[in-house]
Amino acid sequence: MENFNRLNDLYFKKLLGDKKRKNLTLSFLNGILNKDDENCFTDITFLDKDNEPLTLDGKLSKLDIRADLNDGTQVDIEVQVCPFKLMAERSLYYWSKMYSEQLEKGAEYKKLKKAIAINLLAFDYLEDEQDWHNIYNLLNVKSYNKLTDHIEIHFLELPKFTLKDMRKIRVSEAWIAYFSGKYSKEELEEIAMTTPAIKEAVEFEDTFLQNKIERRAYEQREKAIRDYYSYMSAFKEEGLEQGLQEGITLGMKKANINTAINLLKLGVDVDTIVKGTGLSIQDIEALKIKIK
């Protein structure tokens, strides 16, 4: 399928949110988090999100993953296709929920484990950063020493990604190349030669698109997002036009008020000022009181 959107939430959840393909999710996580064979994620348990309704505002339903790294590390993956200015605040909010929900009432803080938020973005977000992958922790602003390793927030900006060498590709780069949609099937097949998980992902994609029900659901979701973009664009244009008109009106009124004040100071009668400025008699009388 041409222009297939691999960030479509229905497809993304089928690919990385299904325990039948948890080996792919492990590959994605271990790659993004730069885990080697000695400390990699070995198993994952998916949170039950089957009943979560799809939103039509471009904020794709969250794919929540609970990853078991033998120490209980929690991981949350979120896909965002529509530009969202408060992405940092949103990510921090969901990170805090993930972190706090580890403890039951009365439990000890020492039971808290590391929580990692991964944001996969289809738009440029961090204006001051050139790299496609940026990681944030809690640091001392003077010494840059880390306060704790319990918080880790990742931003993966797909538009910034460029594959430099197909022959020396890391697992993280292979996955971002796949999700970015920038590379052809032939190029992905070449990538799959060094990253078997991508080969399996491409094969699943073909199976997904051959399923009429799945494909129809995918197309309906894509249409909903396109409609959202169209509506927001129309509302924005209407809002700008309305704002411009309101601004012009407000500016003219301020200018007329200043003119009226100057005329009052010169002793011009109220009727003449009304005719000259368009302000009401009540407005002029109020200005007379104000300047006395």
Language model features with spans:
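Short, charged alpha-helical interaction segments and adjacent helix-coil junctions
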Residues: 2, 75-80, 177-292
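Conserved single-residue anchors adjacent to enzymatic active/cofactor-binding motifs
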Residues: 1-212
